[in-house]
């Protein structure tokens, strides 16, 4: 059974989720809402993308709706989530990708329009967070609003799970070397809450904060309080990389750690965690659907208890694929797929 999905917010993640759904046979996008663009512009932005190339399919406009691959997709321009008539489109699951309605109270407004569940494509202060390959099996159908966490947490958590399961993490620090995003500046500009964040993204390496490492403690309770981290925003348009440095309780050589990660990548975490020994660079990961691609050649160890691990992620494409995977999983648990 195909799960019918609506998207609120047709920005980077909203559009990349749509593109991924085109390759995701058990999910169908039936409606999109964005109050800041009209249908012809939405069609244009879906069709052409500077990072991921042209859309693989026909995109046209019929009246006020999109037609994608011959199928009509209702298009709305409501500012209030409660006013979006999801029920008339058949959309049961809503991807909340505006970056604005990230709390349970705000996101549940979609339920008034007939939606059954809301999946926030961002970290949430109070909604339950699920990371595919890590804790999605704890979902029991009770939450009306859930979060897919962040792209960085989706990269970090599967790797941290493998290391903790096999060797027990005592404590660790994470740095994500992260491509610039839409919230940053093309030229220096005002940013009262984050002065460094107001500097031009194209010329600077910008230290920034991230809650991604601490969020791992929410999806892997055993690691709560054991990890924290920061971000370095760099002048690349897409693809990021996690540097995880940990102390482990059970001594292991770097070769043993590589073996454990490869076993997980080829087994229970296949499709979420990948493993490579190639001499890759960031652009090689553009469009990679995995949450986390472990770079076996990039990591180092000081001794058998102190190690630095490196894992890549396409912070747009891989994350958006997990949003859809989470929806598919949730729908099956709910009995709607």
Swiss-Prot record:
Keyword NAD: yes
Transmembrane segments: none
Entry annotated with the keyword Cytoplasm: yes
Keyword terms, alphabetized: Cytoplasm, Glycolysis, NAD, Oxidoreductase
One BP annotation, GO: glucose metabolic process
Assembly: Homotetramer.
Protein name: Glyceraldehyde-3-phosphate dehydrogenase
Species of the source: Cryphonectria parasitica (Chestnut blight fungus)
Upper lineage: Eukaryota, Fungi, Dikarya, Ascomycota, Pezizomycotina
């Amino acid at each position: 059974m195909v799960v019918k999905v609506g998207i609120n917010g047709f920005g980077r993640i909203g559009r990349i989720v749509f593109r991924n759904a085109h390759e995701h046979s058990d999910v169908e996008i039936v409606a999109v809402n964005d109050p800041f663009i009209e249908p012809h512009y939405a069609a244009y932005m879906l069709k052409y993308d500077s990072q991921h190339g042209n859309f693989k399919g026909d995109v046209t406009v019929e009246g006020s709706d999109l037609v994608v691959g011959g199928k009509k997709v209702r298009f709305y321009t409501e500012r209030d989530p409660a006013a979006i008539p999801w029920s008339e489109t058949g959309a049961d699951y809503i991807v909340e990708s505006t970056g604005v309605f990230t709390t349970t109270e705000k996101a549940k407004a979609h339920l008034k329009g007939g939606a059954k569940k809301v999946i926030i494509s961002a970290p949430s202060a109070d909604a339950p967070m699920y990371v595919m390959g890590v804790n999605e099996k704890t979902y029991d159908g009770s939450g009306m609003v859930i979060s897919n966490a962040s792209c960085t947490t989706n990269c970090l958590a599967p790797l941290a799970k493998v290391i903790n399961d096999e060797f027990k993490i005592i404590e660790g620090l994470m740095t994500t070397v992260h491509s610039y995003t839409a919230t940053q500046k093309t030229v220096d500009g005002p940013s009262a809450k984050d002065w460094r964040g107001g500097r031009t993204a194209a010329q600077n390496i910008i230290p920034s904060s991230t809650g991604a490492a601490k969020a791992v403690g929410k999806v892997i309770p055993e690691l709560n309080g054991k990890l924290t981290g920061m971000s370095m925003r760099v002048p690349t348009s897409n693809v990021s990389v996690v540097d995880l440095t940990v102390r482990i309780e059970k001594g292991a050589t770097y070769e043993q750690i590589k073996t454990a990660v490869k076993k997980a990548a080829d087994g229970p975490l296949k499709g979420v965690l990948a493993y490579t020994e190639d001499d890759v660079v960031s652009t090689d990961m553009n469009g990679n659907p995995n949450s986390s691609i472990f770079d076996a050649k990039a990591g180092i160890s000081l001794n058998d208890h102190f190690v630095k691990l490196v894992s890549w992620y396409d912070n747009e494409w891989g994350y958006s694929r997990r949003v859809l995977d989470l929806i598919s999983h949730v729908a099956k648990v709910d009995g709607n797929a």
